[in-house]
């Protein structure tokens, strides 16, 4: 679903797409949400992204991403071998499983970004989230 679909009746909700590492934002936002993109950044840029999310948010930051481990890599391999066999999907899914951060690495990135008193939790299906209130 495209941004704005379910929130079309709420003019106080807005969306903005930009390169977060270069964007000169004139204002802060209530919520900074980063979903399933952190693993596309190298460690240093991931730290910059987390720092930037904290700077942009007035209230809450939520970062949800893949959690690297054997189950993720085995599951992705099987799914892309048996079901999702398109070459681009196969390549991207397997690369994402390799590049995902482990639970400890995600915590370390948040610490390097200067996050204090943040929460971090594992979820099913090789997911994890960190958040800052």
Task: Show the residue positions of the predicted features.
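A conserved beta-strand element that flanks and buttresses the S-adenosyl-L-methionine
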Residues: 33-34
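Conserved beta-strand signature within the Rossmann-like core of class I S-adenosyl-L-methionine
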Residues: 50-68
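C-terminal lobe and adjacent flexible extensions of AdoMet/dcAdoMet transferase-like proteins
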Residues: 124-133
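Class I SAM-dependent methyltransferase SAM/SAH-binding core
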Residues: 1-23
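C-terminal alpha-helical "lid/dimerization" subdomain adjacent to the S-adenosyl-L-methionine
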Residues: 66-115, 119
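Hydrophobic adenine-recognition pocket in adenosine-nucleotide-binding enzymes
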Residues: 37
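A structural motif
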Residues: 10, 57-58, 115
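Short conserved loop adjoining the S-adenosyl-L-methionine
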Residues: 22-27, 43
């Amino acid at each position: 679903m495209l941004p704005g679909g379910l929130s079309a009746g709420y003019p106080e909700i807005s969306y903005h797409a930009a390169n977060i590492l270069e964007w000169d934002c004139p204002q802060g936002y209530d919520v900074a949400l980063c979903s399933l993109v952190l693993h596309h950044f190298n460690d240093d840029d991931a730290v910059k992204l987390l720092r930037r999310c904290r700077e942009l948010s007035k209230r809450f930051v939520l970062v949800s991403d893949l959690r690297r481990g054997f189950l993720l890599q085995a599951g992705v391999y099987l799914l892309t071998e048996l079901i999702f066999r398109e070459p681009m999907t196969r390549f991207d899914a397997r690369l994402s499983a390799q590049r995902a951060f482990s639970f400890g690495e995600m915590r370390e990135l948040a610490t390097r970004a200067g996050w204090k008193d943040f929460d971090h939790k594992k979820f099913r299906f090789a997911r994890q989230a960190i958040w800052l209130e």
